[in-house]
Amino acid sequence: MTRIRRSPCLLLLIIWFMCIAGSVQVVQSQNQTGATTHPDEARALNSIFAAWKIQAPREWNISGELCSGAAIDASVLDSNPAYNPLIKCDCSFQNSTICRITNIKVYAIDVVGPIPPELWTLTYLTNLNLGQNVLTGSLPPAIGNLTRMQWMTFGINALSGPVPKEIGLLTDLRLLGISSNNFSGSIPDEIGRCTKLQQMYIDSSGLSGRIPLSFANLVQLEQAWIADLEVTDQIPDFIGDWTKLTTLRIIGTGLSGPIPSSFSNLTSLTELRLGDISSGSSSLDFIKDMKSLSVLVLRNNNLTGTIPSTIGEHSSLRQVDLSFNKLHGPIPASLFNLSQLTHLFLGNNTLNGSFPTQKTQSLRNVDVSYNDLSGSLPSWVSLPSLKLNLVANNFTLEGLDNRVLPGLNCLQKNFPCNRGKGIYSDFSINCGGPEKRSVTGALFEREDEDFGPASFFVSAGQRWAASSVGLFAGSSNNIYIATSQSQFVNTLDSELFQSARLSASSVRYYGLGLENGGYTVTLQFAEIQILGSTSTTWKGLGRRRFDIYVQGRLVEKDFDVRRTAGDSTVRAVQRVYKANVSENHLEVHLFWAGKGTCCIPIQGAYGPLISAVSATPDFTPTVANKPPSKGKNRTGTIVGVIVGVGLLSILAGVVMFTIRKRRKRYTDDEELLGMDVKPYIFTYSELKSATQDFDPSNKLGEGGFGPVYKGNLNDGRVVAVKLLSVGSRQGKGQFVAEIVAISSVLHRNLVKLYGCCFEGEHRMLVYEYLPNGSLDQALFGDKTLHLDWSTRYEICLGVARGLVYLHEEASVRIVHRDVKASNILLDSRLVPQISDFGLAKLYDDKKTHISTRVAGTIGYLAPEYAMRGHLTEKTDVYAFGVVALELVSGRPNSDENLEEEKKYLLEWAWNLHEKSRDIELIDDKLTDFNMEEAKRMIGIALLCTQTSHALRPPMSRVVAMLSGDVEIGDVTSKPGYVSDWRFDDTTGSSLSGFQIKDTTGYSMSLVAPGSEISPRDSDFKPMLGSKINEGR
């Protein structure tokens, strides 16, 4: 073969020809039409880019002409990442002399600020992609000008306010993306006019309410994401008419079941994700004809019935998740024979029978934890590279090699290892990281196993264990451990927070073989995957939310690590809970209920995250707290067992005798014994001893119904004993109601009830003792605490969250009626807990109450309650607003020692607001504070204290405003303060019959407690069955 020798001259000649050809192509791109950009659109685009501080690249801005180069080159696609920002033009106007801008892409380049109004003048736009920036402000009604729009996305930004109804004018729209923003208000009905929509992404948008009936018109939809939204009502039946759907996600909403039978029409689906349906049971019948499915996720939906054997006919399935339901019966063998199935999650059901004896080679991840499966395990469980979670079943493990699934014997039903014999008194785990010793000397054991989508682990010595399940949606590289090199500002154990365990669904930690008794459980967190939202990048716009259970009790709902850390990613968060171990077993469960964003900063950035778990005893341990020696002194062991059994028998007899005696003592107290939730019953002698016979030196204060004493129980716990005085007006009925109320609501921002005493004439409540006293003592007392701004803001947020729980989340709805600074207690870490439910009233959703006996404290009373006895949750909202002003100003709601215009805090706050001098309210003692947060708190306080209760926001919206998730609305009316109260001090006085006059001059006389209407008929009557004015 003849070879051609290339000379340098020849190479130069080739290069020259290439350059000429390239130049000709550029000139052609620039001049092939001779058209120019419409001058109005050129000015508009230049203004937009100037406002966003970005420039038009030379590739489509040749010689200053916008519609040139790549902007008119059909070979350059919008999706090409090399061209960003990018516009596209249509130069066919006015005999091909004028170009109109039809496409704009400004994607993921961290543009910060509002959308310039000039954008809405570009009426020839058909494609607008502004996703993954930090755009703020609202979408204006002028969006309706873009009537040619077909593909429009604002996904992953910080846009707020309502979505304008004018979006319904975009009737040619094919794609709408508004996910992962801070919008507020309801989903616009007008979107239903966009009948050509093929893709709709409204997940994590902040919208709420109902899915509009007009959405029944969206029959062209092919993809719909409706997730992480506070929407209500049942899943609409009309979704079954969206028969062109290939992808449907409805996760983490407030929608209730059952799943409509019309869903069986969705036979084109390839991906179906339904999750966290709140009520209503459904079967799996509706999936029968969905033969194109490759992803089927029906997690946490109250599914009942059996798994049909016909599921084996869905040959395209790659992932199946039916976990956290109520399915029963055997597992069909056909499910394990699906040739493309790689991930199978069946955990937390009541499936029974044996494990299928065969599986396909593709199936590498299987979760069947928390079921009733039994029998021997098949041989394939020993295959390498499998991820299996078989925890909490009834498998027979005899003959199983110890190297296969090590520790599974400890994690079968009832967790048998060391059950009935406490050998440990604590445990500490560095979740996702290596062994670390804390500054206090505690050794946090390593937990850096590759859990993957389904796994469990038991520590050496069987002191603790872990179990995790879940597959991150959309992630090609599922990572279950996060790491960081950050140094954390509020802890000496910074290294402990540089790793964290991640889970896409559920992760549990167990303490095994613990000595029975009370424990303090400490959970440590730091958000090391999602950046802080104060960063100037879209990667800081994510929100992670999950639930936390300790010993099966929900202690945190929608817990957000970063928000709790004050929006900081270098601030550690610690949560402390009390737990009782009665069967040598402790469980901490972190569960994702579909809330939070899914894809910021990466696909699959959601679900539980935790840095460390530890538990320490609240009593003096009697065990060695180390693994037992093996094979020594067998005789001693046998003797010990016999003696132990004998002693236990004697002890059991004593306990049974005591219980029977106590029950006999209380047989006449039918109300107490008939309660659904029974707190621990203390004896009078126990509490008398704990308080040193109610020694005056242990007195903490005097409440509305009697004194409160500090006490030390025999198990080492420090408590606050509320002793109801003989003269207290709180009768037996109200006492029982209070016990029921407090026992049924558990939240970190509500004071914890340990138990009660109801013995003869002695009636007492025993609470957790909070060492830092009350908020009014901290702010106004003789020995004030130094509360810096961030602490005050967290206290305000904590109180708001506690009230949200009382009003909207507790199993029984509660209006506190006496929210005030002295009823907000501070724990050792200055976390607020709302106390004193002695004035609380139980009520059903959407009920109200008119009472002639008004209970509360002057200065915190809402006008409609003080003057008319009209009680709703907005009564508490008003009082919260007053507390918020006290936190900002550092002064009580009234102070007779100040000049006239400043005597009454709320009146002074309004006067300053009218003069735009709100910041003068801020406490002079605060030398360093966040001005934006201070203004926010003042604005919220004024919203909460408006005269009309209908104008006050619900507490859930208050939390959203405090958290910065939604903007603060305008205050439209003067605060509802009541002037000319006849009193000397409003900081502690309880209302008890006096004359008041409101700002309109209306005067009335309040009925003193018990003076005209008996408590039995009025005040003590639960508000069940009456009507609430305020709808939710």
From Swiss-Prot:
This is Probable LRR receptor-like serine/threonine-protein kinase At1g56130. It catalyses: L-seryl-[protein] + ATP = O-phospho-L-seryl-[protein] + ADP + H(+); L-threonyl-[protein] + ATP = O-phospho-L-threonyl-[protein] + ADP + H(+). Glycans are attached at residues 31, 61, 95, 145, 182, 265, 302, 337, 348, 352, 394, 580, 633. Its main location: membrane. It comes from Arabidopsis thaliana. The modification Phosphothreonine is found at residues 683, 852, 857. The chain crosses the membrane at residues 637-657. Residues 1008-1032 are annotated as: Disordered. The modification Phosphoserine is found at residues 822, 851. Residues 658-1032 are cytoplasmic. Residues 694-968 form the Protein kinase domain. Residues 1-29 form the signal peptide. Belongs to the protein kinase superfamily. Ser/Thr protein kinase family. The active site is at residue 818. One of its GO terms (cellular component) is plasma membrane. It is found in: Cell membrane. Keywords: ATP-binding, Cell membrane, Glycoprotein, Kinase, Leucine-rich repeat, Membrane, Nucleotide-binding, Phosphoprotein, Receptor, Repeat, Serine/threonine-protein kinase, Signal, Transferase, Transmembrane, Transmembrane helix. Residues 30-636 are extracellular.
